[in-house]
């Protein structure tokens, strides 16, 4: 099944909260997730000239703000992080940013999706061409919610997978190789364990 770009938000078997973002693509498969610094992961084309072909293929997908991780599928990463940085509650930062940025104005009206993770709270949100939703979710050890741009743009108990990995590196590999979801390109995981640990693949 092709579900496009997606987020996976959950807890490892040993109880560590994490969020993984995977790029899946038919049109622009030559991209990487690159750790820019301790607070930022960016999605970049391997050939930088490709960034001029589509405004939505290059963006920061991870921003760390203190003890809060913001992970999304687009440029709204920075907007959400900025709103949290100036003191907005997570729910309000998500709502404001998704509502004002709106869905991507491409040929597919691609939804914007987002996850925000702290040591004791987790939120998911999305805005599509016909819906907007923000939800605080309860995480369970060994399970994770997934939220995608296509086919699975909902926040529901029916969109959960079992998770058997415990490190950010293994989680990246697990999500990249998940047989149910087609066209993997690159991924990044942010795991909370006495601070944030970040991996890419």
Swiss-Prot record:
Gene3D superfamilies: Inosine monophosphate cyclohydrolase-like
A single GO molecular function term of this UniProt record: IMP cyclohydrolase activity
Source domain of life: Archaea
One GO BP annotation of this record: 'de novo' IMP biosynthetic process
Pathway(s) the chain acts in: Purine metabolism; IMP biosynthesis via de novo pathway; IMP from 5-formamido-1-(5-phospho-D-ribosyl)imidazole-4-carboxamide: step 1/1
Disulphide linkage map: none
Alphabetical UniProt keywords: Hydrolase, Purine biosynthesis
Coiled-coil stretches: none
Catalysis: reaction(s): IMP + H2O = 5-formamido-1-(5-phospho-D-ribosyl)imidazole-4-carboxamide
EC number: 3.5.4.10
HAMAP family with a match to the protein in the record: IMP_cyclohydrol (MF_00705)
Protein purpose: Catalyzes the cyclization of 5-formylamidoimidazole-4-carboxamide ribonucleotide to IMP.
Family: Belongs to the archaeal IMP cyclohydrolase family.
Protein name according to UniProt: IMP cyclohydrolase
Lineage: Archaea, Methanobacteriati, Methanobacteriota, Methanomada group, Methanococci
